[in-house]
């Protein structure tokens, strides 16, 4: 029994000795610093700064994956639609800027020019503001500008000195019709001189085979002119309209036609005017009767059968001095014609009632109403005649 106790004691003693040794060994291992592995060498992936250049500052927040603010989305700006374009064309009647050489009486056209001191602006002073504020003014040139002396064999032969062209220029007139029964009053020489004079003055002309083009506000206007004594010219009219139709936004056709002193159009006028519209014309201007006639609105387009006289040097005191300016306003939207509207401006060929002073003047009040009523009366007899709402 004693041997087991001793043996146990010896075993316990041995165990204690072993544990004490282990404890010391473990403490040694903890206190001893562990050698660090050498850090791996990383390759430089950023270019070295150029000599003399400061390296860029690094953003301390680089790589921060915090919330990103979204940039506000700008609403698309709606473009304003282009404004409509309104083209105003003024049409007026017979302008005899000169006289017959046999008219040597007091108050002939040349005599009046002398009395006003050669002032070119005098003759159209009463309507200049109207012509200044339109896009195009077109009148019938019922004369020649020439110094020729050889005349046609006829009763009245009109001419004016070539310098008289300044009257048209100072009147703010851009274009004239030359197809009429007086353009050859001084034969071929007179005709050639007239065209040369107009060219030198920068005035456009249409008729007798010539076509005129004029542009305003990006809109092109074409003008044609004819002596319309019969309907034999229909093929030529149609061909010419088709030719210029592809080049112009507005086509104007002038006819010198009808019977003098008659206030109603004849059958030729009615047929030719409506034919021109059917062929593609946008407005028809008529002259020759020397008095006013009615107006058709045919298929939405105007036929002015006679504008009457205007600045008329062919008579020092005609009994009927009534006339008018017809303005046709064309409205375009995105290059397309969307409306055609007519305006009648009643006038007198003279600023005086007792004599022709060759100064067309706008009428007012009762006189303007009287002329307007005449036009409406003559129009009422037409199949497509206008009313008060032209």
What is the meaning of each model-derived region?
Residues 22-37, 41-43, 47, 51, ...:
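Acidic, metal/ion-coordinating pockets
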Residues 2-26:
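Sec-dependent N-terminal signal peptides of Gram-positive bacterial secreted proteins and lipoproteins
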């Amino acid at each position: 029994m004693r041997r087991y106790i001793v043996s146990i004691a010896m075993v316990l003693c041995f165990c204690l000795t072993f544990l004490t040794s282990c404890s010391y060994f473990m403490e040694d291992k903890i206190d001893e610093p562990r050698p660090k592995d050498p850090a791996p060498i990383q390759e430089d992936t950023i270019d070295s700064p150029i000599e003399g250049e400061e390296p860029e500052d690094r953003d301390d927040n680089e790589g921060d994956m915090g919330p990103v603010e979204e940039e506000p989305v700008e609403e698309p700006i709606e473009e304003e639609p282009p404004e409509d374009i309104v083209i105003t064309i003024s049409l007026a009647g017979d302008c005899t800027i000169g006289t017959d050489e046999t008219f040597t009486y007091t108050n002939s056209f040349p005599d009046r020019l002398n009395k006003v001191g050669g002032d070119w602006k005098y003759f159209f002073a009463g309507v200049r503001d109207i012509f200044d504020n339109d896009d195009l003014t077109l009148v019938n040139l019922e004369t020649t500008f020439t110094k020729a002396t050889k005349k046609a064999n006829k009763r009245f032969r009109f001419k004016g000195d070539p310098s008289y062209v300044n009257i048209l220029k100072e009147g703010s007139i851009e274009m004239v019709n030359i197809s009429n029964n007086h353009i050859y009053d001084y034969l071929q020489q007179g005709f050639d001189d007239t065209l040369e004079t107009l060219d030198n003055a920068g005035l456009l002309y249409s008729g007798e085979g010539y076509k005129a083009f004029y542009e305003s506000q990006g809109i092109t206007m074409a003008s044609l002119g004819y002596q319309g004594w019969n309907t034999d010219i229909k093929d030529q009219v149609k061909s010419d309209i088709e030719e210029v139709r592809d080049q112009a936004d507005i086509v104007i056709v002038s006819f010198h036609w009808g019977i003098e002193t008659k206030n109603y159009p004849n059958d030729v006028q009615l047929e030719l005017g409506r034919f021109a519209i059917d062929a593609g014309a946008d407005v028809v201007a008529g002259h020759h009767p020397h008095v006013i006639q009615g107006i058709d609105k045919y298929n939405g387009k105007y036929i002015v059968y006679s504008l009457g006289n205007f600045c008329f040097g062919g008579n020092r005191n005609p009994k009927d001095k009534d006339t008018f300016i017809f303005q046709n306003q064309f409205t375009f939207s995105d290059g397309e014609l969307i409306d055609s509207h007519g305006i009648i401006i009643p006038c007198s060929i003279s600023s005086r009632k007792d004599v022709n002073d060759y100064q067309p003047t706008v009428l007012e009040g009762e006189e303007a109403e009287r002329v307007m009523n005449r036009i409406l009366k003559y129009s009422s007899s037409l199949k497509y005649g206008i009313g008060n709402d032209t």
